[in-house]
Amino acid sequence: MFGASNNEELKNVIKNGALLIDVRTPSEFADGSVKGAINIPVDSIEKQINKIKNKNNIVVFCRSGARSALAKRILEQNGFKNVVNGKTKNNVNTCLVEV
């Protein structure tokens, strides 16, 4: 289930209280994000692992899906198992509204 790009699965993860992480830059995040999301830029995600180490389900997203794919890979390499690439901010927002 985790890691699939299917929006139904993404909606289920969000419904079950996943941590939403916007991996864009702080300035992009300041211009608007997803309600309830935290900002951890992809280039500093490894340094901030301790902030999220106790989270079971995580959704990462960005502007195009490229940085979130990288963030997902980094988190998985650091032992996280339930990481979903939500791809874009707009995609996650759409799924959040539909939950």
Predicted regions span which residues?
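Rhodanese-like catalytic fold shared by cysteine-dependent sulfurtransferases
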Residues: M1-L19, P26-N57, A66-V99
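Short, surface-exposed ligand- or partner-binding patches at beta-edge/loop junctions that are enriched
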Residues: F61
